[in-house]
Structure formats: structure tokens, C-alpha cells
Amino acid sequence: MAKTVLLIEDEPNIIEAVQYILSRDGWQVKTHANGHDANAVIKTSLPDLIILDVMLPGKSGYDILREIRLTPECLEIPVLMLTARGQTKDRQMAEALGESRFMTKPFSNQEMLDAVRELAGA
């Protein structure tokens, strides 16, 4: 059975790229495009891995990550944070909230694939 990745991202080109990269490697990729109800989607789908954009409409990725780490059934789900802002303070905030890995956009296909494989233990 394919492992599931939940991609929470609002940029269509990033969604398309991640779906392409991961589906070719056998991953099932589910997508969600806003922060409003992202945590409800996470709780109902319980993916093997979450790829979470920092800047989303409705709620920031940081707020979503904080809620993920306060939800017992989601504590062990690895979270890869994506951002166009790769400043030290952004990395530190994500790390303090419990991200598993931080990646800046743009990224290469191989960078994304390596990160997902590492985090999901594949």
C-alpha cells in the first residue's frame, strides 16, 4: 500500500510539482489549499507525512503546526515545512514548534524526494 502525503499548499505550480515528483515514486498525494480547516483534514486523513506551506490563506503554517503538535493522534506525523522565506528566524520558529524538516522554495525534484523518503522512513 502506498504511503500517503498530505500537501497543504496554495500555489498551483508547487502543488503540481510535488504531485509529479512524489506520485512517480509511488506516493499517494492528497492536497489541501488553505489554512482554515487544514487541521480537520489532517485529523480525518492521518497521513504518513505532511508537507506544509508557511504562508497560507486563512491560517499560517506555523499555527497549523502548533495545532498538529497539540493533537495526540498527530504527534508522530513528520512535518516538512515549505517556505519562500528561508531566514534563520523562520527556521527557528518552525523548529521550536516541532517541524521535522524545513525546506525553502524553490527546491529541486531530488531535494523534495530525498526529504520525503527520509522523513517517511522509506
Q: Language-model segments: which ranges?
A:
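Short hydrophobic/Thr-rich beta-strand motif most characteristic of the beta2 strand and flanking loop
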Residues: 26-33, 41
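Acidic catalytic/metal-coordinating carboxylates
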Residues: 34, 60-66
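Active-site beta3 strand of CheY-like receiver
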Residues: 45-51, 56
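C-terminal output helix
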Residues: 107-117
